[in-house]
Structures are given as C-alpha cells and as structure tokens.
C-alpha cells in the first residue's frame, strides 16, 4: 500500500492518495486511443461506459452525453487536441466535448472524486525503455495505484503501479521507476532524509526533504492548473495538463437512456 505524508501546513496539504485506492481496470484514455462499444474506464466506484445504445455514461458520477439511440456501433476517441469525440459506426460525429487546445498528447482520466477530466498536453515523460545514467535493474515491488494528481504526495516507499511497472518514492530519497528494459531513477540516493514527492499545480514533480529543501525537480513547470502523473501500462510515467475539460454532475431527472438501471 502507498504510504502518504499528511501535512498540517495548508501550503502543501493538497489531495492525498488514499491508502486503499487501487485502480480497477484501465482508468485513462490517451490521445489516439478508442473506447469501443461496451468499453469501460473505471476508478473505484466510478465507471465510464461507452454503451451499446451510443450513450456515454459515467455511473455514480451523475453524467452522460445524452446520445442514447443516436447511433450504432459508437466509439469514443480522444483527439490530439484534447477533444473527446463519439463517432457513429459510419464515421459520423454524434457528440464532442468541444474543448480543444493546442496539438499534443492528452489523457482523459476517471478522477477518484467521480469526474471525467481531460488533461494535457503532456509536459514531462520518464522513459524506462532507453539506456542512460538513470538506468537500473528491475526488482519486484508490491502493487498499488497508478495516478498522482496535483497536490498529492508520496513518501517513504509510497508508490504508483501499473502492471509490472512501479514508480517508488524510496525512503533513501531516490525516486525510482522499476520496469521497462532499463528502468529509471532520479539519482538522489542519500541526498536527504524523510523525502517526499509532490506534483504541483504547474505540472512539476518535486522531491523535497524534511527541511523542505528541493532535492530534485522534473523542471517541467508550465501554466497554473490541475495536472496528473500517469504511470501507464506501457511503463512510461507521463505528466499531463493542465485540465481543459471535465464532466459536471447532472440532475437526476436528466439522467435518461440508461441501459443499466439502479447504478447511479
């Protein structure tokens, strides 16, 4: 289980990764990827479904695209401009989020608080598949979740995991990505005590020690907003942001066209 440092100082409080939080299946969609008919994205009790009736529904999040019976064999895609698009089987557009940004790599994430949020473009990437000074040998580490949002903190062997890949904020102050062919590390072993990792609201990963001295930074500072670090199933650890679109709960009476009743 990820161990998380709970700070009393408001300046660094933020959202903490729950100890029991474990991703239930895939919880993100990347630019160029497709969520097929009856496909799911899940995070805890929240389930985004591209339904057979062409309606995109976020169960327990009180949101839907209101496109029931407006197409057949519909699919959801995320474009290189951060826009979510539902297309009919004949290729025609049924619905779009209408939230375009600059061209880049984006991620649509089922947030643990029950929202679907589009982050991007990507501002930083850790690649464990290429050799270099930051390479290391793989070893087995216990499993936990794969997302870190702005304001969240990992410390003392707290970790993100995706399949056999593990991103660990080790107790020796070294940030290590186990997996891939070569792995990756921040090369900060022994550089501080009681170190913690935090993703700030400018898309920058920062390691600080117990004196709040900066030990390491991703140097990926961008404009202010909400960001997410995703440890992807392919082993890449990528920061996306800021958030450019998100769902908002709809009134119960507007939640129509559901295939599965009683889940909201």
UniProtKB/Swiss-Prot annotation:
Gene Ontology CC annotation, any one: extracellular region
Keywords carried by this UniProt record: Disulfide bond, Hemagglutinin, Lectin, Magnesium, Mannose-binding, Metal-binding, Repeat, Secreted, Signal
Sequence motif Carbohydrate-binding motif 1, location on chain: 51-59
Biotechnology note: May be used as a potent insecticidal agent against hemipteran insects.
Cell compartment(s), UniProt: Secreted
Subunit structure: Forms heterotetramer of 2 chains 1 and 2 chains 2 arranged as a dimer of chain 1 and chain 2 heterodimers.
Protein name (record): Mannose-specific lectin CEA
Gene (name only): CEA
